Structures are given as structure tokens and as C-alpha cells.
């Protein structure tokens, strides 16, 4: 593994660059997935995703292509995200669903806040969502020793009887995974006794260090649950009655609409305003836009295959399912950059337009939108120019937010990604070309985040929700990297994010006052070490110790 920074790059860096160039071509980015297994492999295996690294942008790109990121480990860590928590978020977002957490009752402690949240997010989309309905099998010491499959059977039947849900998502947590409970056999046994499809989710926290593996777990469970994605033949459509004198006209109208229809795949981190902004841009090109799968009903999923193209708004979230639809139904898909900021939005819309032969129309639209945005950002740019920002969260959001920060004249002091793989190389190559060789960590550890911020001394942070409190305790004001309450996507989102940065920098008293009255739980000796002191490569050496 290469540990030198750009200033001391070894001679074999050229070879690594050639590997990177080959790996980032779309033709090379093919997933080798077996959709017939009980559960999917973790992303450390399928995508060589790394969860621990310290260095700079060029090091991360090179080592991602070489597969070295997956070899890094920590000799010390605090808590980290659990893939079960991520899996339940998607389950809650499916209209009229029920989630069953098979495990001790404490595994559901983080889910109470989702009740109001899911209803609100649904209403923002014009949909009446039920409460976040979930059961726990509440395994006791006795069941942990003797098995809890009977409790799971009872919970499934009770959930189906009480709610008649659209789907029942069954989460396999750590304890039953360790003792060997067979949820697949239980679900197979009960399929004929329930009205709801039963979706197995093998998501114990210890199973994957890359918590985004949970997205693959959910989509794998959905495709195994028996939902119908088969295209509906014309003859089965009532409007397409062969005896109808307008039969041929209606079929042609349908075929034309389908040829201009795209499916966009959302996430809980993508708000209704984000969806509206992207819909506005794509419908201006004459395209028909639909959103799946979150905040939709499983009955609607049958129409997924009635489209010309699938598009991931965040491929970290949806690539697994899009690959399944491609292999099973020959549906093409593209993976454009998440549309935050002018550069990423132009790339997102242009790539979709190219598929439909609409590049010229897209260029005219985007030129006009960018001119309006540039004028709106001018006064903001004058006030925030030169201010230092650190950005942390999922790598697609982090990278595009960094390009937006540069667009308004800010200096990106550092980036901190929860994980990283080669699917980010095209974006991060643009970051290196535009922003320079920025210090970049791969970390989900609060201790490393605090150390990094102490050394970089940013004026402001853009943080994954829930982590801004660490910034504010350090005296650094923070705004959210994403939120359902605001717009982030497209040109409207670029302006709103820039405006929030401007307003936050104008008054930093809250974070300053908080830092004067809060003592963080870390020793001064920790701040004297590199933030990546505990991240080692397979030879036992610290990775990227001179990055900051």
C-alpha cells in the first residue's frame, strides 16, 4: 500500500494511476452478485469498500483501485453505525408496512423517533403514511439459549392479523444470528398463512463494518420476497382492448410514454423538495419522472419495469437493486453523481439527457439555470470567500458539497467519508483536479473526527445529521449535509445550501459559547497524535500519518 502523500509519491504511482483510470470506466464497474443466496455479501467483499483510511484524495483513489482500502483495520474504535438501524429506516418508509425486529427489545430503542418523521415525510410527498409500526420479539435470556423462532412466528402472525400490512420486514439482529435462528425457514413456513409478503433482512450489526451494506440487504430481501416486477402485457391492460377502435393509437401512446419514462430511486436522506427540483428539471426536457421505492406502496412496484431507464440519485443506496433489475428484466441504468451543486447537477441531467438523445435541449436548460444561480450566489460569494470548511458523511454527498463550496469561493480544508470504494473515483478525481489534493479520511469514529477538526481549524462544518454536535462543542458551527426539511438538489438546492452557509457564518455565537462550557472526553495527548493513529494497513503500519 502506498503511504506517501503527493509530495513524496513513489515511482510506481504511475502504474496505480493506470489502474485507477481503467477501474473508473463504466465498462469496468460490473458487480458480480449472486441473487439466489439467502443474504448478500457485505460490501467489503462485493465492492472492496473501505471503512478506515487516512491520507489525501490521490492516495484514496489509488488504493481504492488496488483494493487496498478493504485491508485497513483499527487497533482501537468506539461505537459505529449498525446496519440494522439503516435497514429499519427503509422498512419504515414503505407505505403501510410493518417491521419486526427479531432480537432483544433494546434493538428497537432508536426507532421511536421515526413515528412522526415517516408521517411527515410522507405528507410532504402528498402521501398518507401510517405510523412507523414495529414489533420486537423481545428475546430473553431463555430464548437466547434455547432459540426464539416460536416468538418470531407469533409476532409475524400478530402483525399480519392486526394491521394487514403491505409487507412485513423481518430484521435478523445480532443475538439470533449468533445462536443460529433460521428466520428463512420460519418465513417460508408462514407465507401461506399471511396476507402480507414476508421480507427477510439479515442485518446483524457485527456482520458488516460498512454499514451501507444494509441497503443491499434490504433490496436482496425485497427481490426474495416474491414481489411482482414482471412487465404487464398489453392485453392485460383494460384500455388496450383489441376490440377498441382506438386500440393501436392507445398502444402507441403507451409505448411513447414508456420510452420517455425514467425511474429515480430515492432514500430517506433525499427530501420531497429534492425530488421536486429534479422532477422540474427533467420534466422540462419532456421526460416522465417516477420515484421508487421509499414512500411508495408495494402494489406500485409492479410498474417499475414499465420504464425506459433506471437512475440512482445516490448509487451508494440503490446500485444493488438496479443491477438486479438489469439482470432479471434487461432494464438499463446509469449512476450519475448525486446532483448537489452546479457541476454535479449538470452532470446528472446531462447523462440522463444523453440516454434519450436530448443533449442540446439539456444544454440550453442548464446554461440558463446556471446563469440565474451565478447571479444569485454573487453576494454570498463575496461574504464567504476564503472561509475554510470541513465536510463529513457519505462520500457522494461529501464530494459534491465540496465542489459547491469551491463554487462559492470557500476553501475545503478536509473531507471525512464514512466509507469509500471505486464508484467514487470519477467524482473524487474531479475534486483533486478542482480543489487540489485535499486531506481526506475514511472514518466513522467520533474521536478521529474531533482530532481532525482540531488540526484543520475550519470556520464551518457541513456534517451528517447527528454529528454536528461534535463540531459545535469544538466551537465550529455546523449545518446538515442533508435534511428532509430543506432542498439540496439541483440549482434551487445549491442556492439554499449556500445561503445557509452564509447565515451560519454570520453568527457563530452559539458554537463559541458552547465550546467555552463543554469539556470533551479526550486527553490532550490524543490531539497530539495524527487523527489516523489507530488505522493500520495489513503490515501493521499507520496509514497516511503525514496527511495533516
Residue ranges and their predicted role:
Residues 2-548:
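An N-terminal assembly and electron-transfer interface module characteristic of large anaerobic redox
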Amino acid at each position: 500500500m502506498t503511504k506517501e502523500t503527493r509530495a513524496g509519491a513513489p515511482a510506481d504511482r504511475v502504474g496505480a494511476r493506470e489502474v485507477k483510470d481503467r477501474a473508473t470506466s463504466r465498462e469496468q464497474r460490473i458487480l458480480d452478485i449472486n441473487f439466489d443466496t439467502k443474504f448478500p455479501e457485505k460490501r467489503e467483499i462485493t465492492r472492496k469498500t473501505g471503512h478506515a483510511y487516512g491520507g489525501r484524495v490521490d492516495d484514496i483513489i489509488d488504493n481504492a483501485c488496488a483494493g487496498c482500502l478493504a485491508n485497513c483495520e483499527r487497533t482501537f474504535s468506539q461505537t459505529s453505525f449498525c446496519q440494522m438501524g439503516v435497514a429499519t429506516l427503509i422498512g419504515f418508509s414503505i407505505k403501510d408496512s410493518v417491521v419486526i425486529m427479531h432480537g432483544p427489545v433494546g434493538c428497537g430503542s432508536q426507532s421511536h423517533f421515526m413515528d412522526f418523521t415517516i408521517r411527515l415525510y410522507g405528507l410532504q410527498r402528498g402521501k398518507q403514511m401510517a405510523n412507523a409500526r414495529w414489533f420486537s420479539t423481545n428475546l430473553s435470556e431463555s430464548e437466547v439459549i434455547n432459540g426464539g423462532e416460536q416468538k418470531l412466528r407469533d409476532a409475524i402472525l400478530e402483525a399480519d392479523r392486526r394491521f394487514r400490512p403491505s409487507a412485513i420486514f423481518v430484521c435478523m439482529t445480532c443475538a439470533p444470528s449468533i445462536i443460529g435462528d433460521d428466520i428463512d425457514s420460519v418465513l417460508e413456513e408462514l407465507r401461506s398463512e399471511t396476507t402480507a409478503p414476508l421480507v427477510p433482512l439479515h442485518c446483524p450489526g457485527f456482520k458488516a463494518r460498512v454499514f451501507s451494506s444494509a441497503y443491499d440487504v434490504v433490496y436482496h430481501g425485497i427481490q426474495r420476497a416474491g414481489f411482482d416486477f414482471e412487465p404487464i402485457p398489453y392485453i392485460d391492460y383494460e384500455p388496450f382492448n383489441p376490440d377498441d377502435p382506438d386500440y393501436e393509437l392507445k398502444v402507441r401512446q403507451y409505448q411513447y410514454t414508456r420510452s420517455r419514462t425514467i425511474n429515480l430511486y430515492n432514500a430517506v436522506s433525499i427530501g420531497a423538495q429534492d425530488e421536486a427540483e429534479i422532477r422540474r428539471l427533467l420534466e422540462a426536457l419532456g421526460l416522465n419522472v417516477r420515484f421508487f421505492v421509499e414512500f411508495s406502496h408495494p402494489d406500485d412496484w409492479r410498474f417499475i419495469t414499465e420504464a425506459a431507464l433506471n437512475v440512482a440519485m445516490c448509487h451508494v443506496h440503490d446500485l444493488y437493486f438496479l443491477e438486479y433489475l438489469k439482470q432479471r428484466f434487461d432494464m438499463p441504468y446509469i449512476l450519475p453523481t448525486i446532483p448537489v451543486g452546479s457541476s454535479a447537477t449538470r452532470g446528472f441531467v446531462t447523462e440522463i439527457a444523453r440516454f434519450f438523445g436530448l443533449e442540446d435541449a439539456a444544454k440550453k436548460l442548464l446554461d440558463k439555470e446556471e446563469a440565474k444561480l451565478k447571479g444569485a450566489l454573487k453576494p454570498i460569494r463575496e461574504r464567504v470567500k476564503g472561509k475554510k470548511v470541513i465536510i463529513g458523511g457519505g462520500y457522494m454527498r461529501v464530494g459534491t458539497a465540496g465542489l459547491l463550496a469551491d463554487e462559492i469561493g470557500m476553501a475545503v480544508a478536509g473531507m471525512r467519508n464514512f466509507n469509500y470504494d471505486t464508484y467514487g473515483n470519477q467524482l473524487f478525481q474531479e475534486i483533486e483536479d478542482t480543489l487540489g489534493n485535499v486531506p481526506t479520511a475514511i472514518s466513522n469514529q467520533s474521536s478521529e473526527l474531533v482530532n481532525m477538526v482540531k488540526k484543520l481549524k475550519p470556520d464551518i462544518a457541513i456534517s451528517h445529521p447527528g454529528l454536528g454536535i461534535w463540531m459545535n462543542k469544538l466551537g465550529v458551527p455546523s449545518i446538515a449535509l442533508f435534511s428532509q426539511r430543506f432542498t439540496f438538489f439541483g440549482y434551487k438546492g445549491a442556492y439554499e445550501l449556500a445561503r445557509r452557509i452564509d447565515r451560519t457564518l454570520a453568527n457563530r455565537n452559539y458554537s463559541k459559547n458552547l465550546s467555552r462550557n463543554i469539556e470533551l472526553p479526550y486527553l490532550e495527548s490524543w490531539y497530539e497524535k495524527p487523527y489516523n493513529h489507530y488505522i493500520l494497513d495489513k503490515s501493521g503500519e499507520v496509514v497516511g500519518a503525514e496527511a495533516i
